Amino acid sequence: MAFWGVEVKPGKTFTLKNNEATGIRRLHLSQATLGHGTATNRSILQCNVGNKSPLLLCVLTPDKVDSCQLNLEFEETDEVIFSVIGPRSVHLTGYFLGRSTGFRPNDDESESFGEDIVDTDMEKGSSDDYDYSDSFINDDDPAVRGSHVSSTDDDEISIKEMTAKTKEKKKNGKGRRLRKKFQVSDSDSDETSARADESSNEDSVEVLNNGNEPKIAKVHSSESPLPSRVTRSKARKSTLESGEPAKCEKTFEAKINTHKTLDNREDKPLDDAKLSPVQKDCEILSKKKRNKERSKSSAIIIDSDDGEGKNMPESLQNENPVSDKGIKSSSDVLLSQNGDATLSKKKKKRDRREETTDVPECPEKKKQAIDKNIEKEAGTKKPLETRTLSNGVIIEDIEKGKLDGKSAVKGKKVSILYTGKLKDTGNLFDSNLGEDPLRFRLGGENVIEGLSIGVEGMRVGDKRRLIIPPALGYSKRGLKEKVPKSAWLVYEVEAVKIR
């Protein structure tokens, strides 16, 4: 690799030419960086390859994107022209690569003994077109050839011994090792045989040819047994080399049968008769717990419905005796299991008390309670300041909020909590306590005029009592049947939010 860099200035182009002496050179373009300058406009880098239309590579903007990482390689027979569109130059950096080399599919795979393959002229092709005549050593050659050693038994030849033998072969120049990646062929012809991929999870067979005495190693399988077609092809291969098919078939079939028996044993579930006594006790206890939970839930439902049974329809009332019988039977079972009737009765009573105490109150009752508490507090609190306006509205300041908060002025949106009562009778006719605050624009027509006048000038957290005359209340229309037209109104108001 050789470093490469250039500055492409605006209005000028840079042409990348191939070197005629060394042939085509591969340029790896790594980064584009904005040059020095005071211009704030963006600069665009583009390139032309031969007569093709220009392509934009990156856009650089000062103070935002000053550099851009690129990962581009140029190996073109035509000229590559770089140019800049914009006020500032662009610096390009990268490096030259060597000549392009072909892809080697077996580069990532390592030889079984850490040695490279030499003197092997292999061509890509299908398993049917390839001639395997040169793939095996003749029987006359006393050299020992081995594939991957997958056996870990003590009787197997160790890796160290195999490496020593291969070194001796190289010194003498007699042995030559060859490795190929075979695939299992679908045809059952005698000319081609199945080849298994070389990996740690696949079955491997080691054949040692010493004269005419074949030795077949054990088959080691980590995940699954060999398919029948592979066994046939391998057995056929061994017959061609050694002439003893019986031994090969017996060894392969014995291994496959052992795998099948082991798989069948693992797949069979355990019967109930073979369970240990501890497991049986656990199952009985879990069933008892389920029965208890069911009986408790059904008892609670019936006890809560006892008070409302009178108002229920006849169809639902007729269903109660059936459920009672079912509960009695389940409770009898529980009594027979526990042996103590008094404890179960106490538990039922306790559950009934908890059910009665945990019944949630109605929202209307809660609201009434809140209103009563507010009325008591408002009645006990004395006004800090009282003033009467010229239009008859009486304003009593009960509590001061934030002194530095926003003041309610006409045109602003105000959110308030309020309670409205009649001055003469004290009856509550309107309230939003416990609900969302009332939101309106001050000076608008969404609320009565007296309420809008009384809220003006309040800050967040302020509380006021407003006494509004009928003329500024509901004198024109009234409020349904709750407020007569001639009624004086008393509002307790709290400012929650001012915008």
Swiss-Prot record:
Residues 167-182 have a biased composition (Basic residues). Residues 108-120, 128-141 have a biased composition (Acidic residues). The keyword Transcription regulation does not apply. Coiled coil: none annotated. Residues 101-365 are annotated as: Disordered. Residues 411-499 form the PPIase FKBP-type domain. It catalyses: [protein]-peptidylproline (omega=180) = [protein]-peptidylproline (omega=0). Belongs to the FKBP-type PPIase family. This is Peptidyl-prolyl cis-trans isomerase FKBP43. It comes from Arabidopsis thaliana (Mouse-ear cress). The gene is FKBP43.
